[in-house]
Amino acid sequence: MEAIKKKMQMLKLDKENAIDRAEQAEADKKQAEDRCKQLEEEQQGLQKKLKGTEDEVEKYSESVKEAQEKLEQAEKKATDAEAEVASLNRRIQLVEEELDRAQERLATALQKLEEAEKAADESERGMKVIENRAMKDEEKMELQEMQLKEAKHIAEEADRKYEEVARKLVVLEGELERSEERAEVAESKCGDLEEELKIVTNNLKSLEAQADKYSTKEDKYEEEIKLLGEKLKEAETRAEFAERSVAKLEKTIDDLEDEVYAQKMKYKAISEELDNALNDITSL
């Protein structure tokens, strides 16, 4: 830009010099015309006064001829100076137009630079928001993973308790069968001895009480198994929900990664455009 201004100043100086030369040529032309007019008047006077003196007439004719040649040269110089002035005016106009275009390109580049800076700021803010969201999602995912581990642990514990209760029920059923067998043996001996019948009856009552006790325990175990089954079902439901949440979070993370990649590509394109604009400014 500074070089263009210096070039314009030099062109303006050349224009002023050309104008001065043109004015000087005009002055020479006028002087030559005046001299020519004066010589013509003198020639006419001499022709009237010295008609017989051909040498003098020829001398003055040569002077007139020289004056006319000088006049033609002055006219030619004036014409050349005017042409040079016109050429300089055209060059100045072209330089001014080039300067206007350069200023327009500079303004456009500055505007693009400002827009690129704004876009970069917006992209940076967007990336910070995305990073915060990703961080929150990671924390949420970690919490849900802990809940999933806890649910799996509860389910495993419920399975273990269920197996333990099932084993106890098998043992109780075996004891009940053995008690029933003993009761049958006692009943078979009932017809032989009344005394043994009483003993057997008492034993039977004791066995019945024990059977009732076992029945109460069995009901209790069944109720506990039912509760454990409900807890297991609830744990399985929580595990399924946690798995769905993890899948949803994985999809959200994938979407966020895609969005971050798109923002990076957009920022890269803006940077390239900004570099091109700066190169255009530098080339000016």
UniProtKB/Swiss-Prot annotation:
The keyword Cytoplasm applies. Residues 22-66 are annotated as: Disordered. Residues 22-40, 51-66 have a biased composition (Basic and acidic residues). GO terms for biological process: actin filament organization; muscle contraction. Keywords: Acetylation, Actin-binding, Coiled coil, Cytoplasm, Cytoskeleton, Muscle protein. It is found in: Cytoplasm, Cytoskeleton. Pfam families: Tropomyosin. One of its GO terms (molecular function) is actin filament binding. Its main location: cytoplasm. It comes from the Eukaryota. One of its GO terms (cellular component) is actin filament. Binds to actin filaments in muscle and non-muscle cells. Plays a central role, in association with the troponin complex, in the calcium dependent regulation of vertebrate striated muscle contraction. Smooth muscle contraction is regulated by interaction with caldesmon. In non-muscle cells is implicated in stabilizing cytoskeleton actin filaments. Homodimer. Heterodimer of an alpha (TPM1, TPM3 or TPM4) and a beta (TPM2) chain. This is Tropomyosin beta chain. It comes from Gallus gallus (Chicken). The gene is TPM2.
